[in-house]
A protein has these predicted regions:
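A surface-exposed beta-strand-loop module
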Residues: 237-238, 248-293
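Short helix-to-coil transition segments within interhelical loops
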Residues: 1-7
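N-terminal, polar/Ser/Thr-rich
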Residues: 45, 158-222
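Membrane-helix interface segments
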Residues: 4, 45, 76-81
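Surface-exposed beta-strand/loop patches in extracellular or lumenal glycoproteins
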Residues: 228-248
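Short, well-ordered beta-strand segments enriched in hydrophobic/aromatic residues
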Residues: 222-232, 288
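Terminal transmembrane helical anchor/hairpin motif
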Residues: 77-156, 177-195
């Protein structure tokens, strides 16, 4: 034979993969046509490209790669078919929506919502999770070429396949570690913010009588100028104004009645220190400029 196991496996994988990818593109083209000509909403091409990259390709890679690897090891297509159907149902029904979508190999549960305003809100999560699935699928394909004994294969081809397996598994492991570290940090942040909110719940807060927000959208960030009238509770005076603001937004300037005021941040809690206490039921004007994601 003039070709190796690697050529044979790649031919099978690309043949099946291109067939499914072609069907996917046909379906997306039909949906895009309906979206473009029959839906009274602005047309955006980005969701179709991103869905193909993060939805279709990793799923094809991991399902086809794992299938050919199991066939090579178990040498029973019927058994592999049953195992793959069981795995698909397990990921679709039981594991897909759990563990931060890490086992959602079909891409059915993980959010892929596109916004004209902010784009993909979870781009980092998609790259890490779906990148892990893609690399694992490629590693399975290379391992199939390495373990198959159908055709003779040169030493260089074996070394290439082994290098691909090690590289892809290493990359998938690194992405997985980054992902779980980020999820752990996010969980810790939510717990910390919940505890801070529980403590702040006992603190008297001003109420907003009126507010004016000037929002400037700058790519993936926003710049906001806020002009608010705040009123103290009727029964208590305030020497500190307790406000809440997304921790991803950084306060650049803050003033009380057009005079600069000092403030402190504790995650989402913003404490504005007043030069003189705000009497009960009295009002005050606060201006603030902040920006961030």
């Amino acid at each position: 034979h003039s070709y190796s196991n690697l050529d044979y496996v790649l031919g099978k994988v690309f043949g099946v993969g291109w067939a499914f990818l072609f069907l996917q593109l046909v379906i997306l083209a039909a949906v895009a046509g309906i979206h473009r000509f029959f839906v009274p909403l602005p047309f955006a091409w980005q969701p179709y490209v991103l869905y193909t990259l993060f939805g279709t390709l990793p799923t094809l890679a991991v399902t086809i790669g794992l299938s050919v690897l199991l066939v090579t090891i178990l040498r029973s297509q019927a058994l592999v078919f049953v195992l793959m159907v069981g795995l698909a149902m397990l990921c679709l029904i039981v594991l897909g929506h759990r563990y931060h979508y890490y086992f959602d190999i079909l891409g059915f549960h993980i959010p892929m919502m596109w916004s004209d305003f902010v784009g993909l809100g979870n781009l980092e999560q998609l790259i890490q999770v779906r990148g892990t699935h893609l690399l694992f699928g490629v590693a399975c394909v290379a391992a199939t070429a390495l373990l198959s004994r159908r055709l003779r294969q040169s030493r260089s081809a074996n070394l290439l396949a082994a290098a691909v397996v090690i590289s892809c598994l290493g990359g998938a492991t690194w992405l997985s570690m980054q992902y779980w570290e980020a999820r752990s940090a996010t969980t810790h942040l939510r717990t910390q913010m919940r505890d801070l909110s529980a403590v702040a719940a006992a603190t008297s807060m001003p109420s907003a009588i009126s507010y004016d927000l000037q929002v400037d959208h700058q790519g993936t960030q926003i710049a906001v100028e806020a002009d608010m009238i705040l009123r103290a509770p009727a029964e208590v005076a305030l020497d500190t104004l307790l406000l809440t603001l997304n921790p991803g937004l950084n306060v650049e300037e803050l003033s009380i009645d057009d005079a600069p005021a000092s403030f402190t941040r504790d995650q989402h809690l913003l404490r504005v220190h007043l030069a003189r206490p705000l009497a009960a039921a009295d009002s005050i004007r606060l201006k603030m400029r902040y920006r961030g994601q």
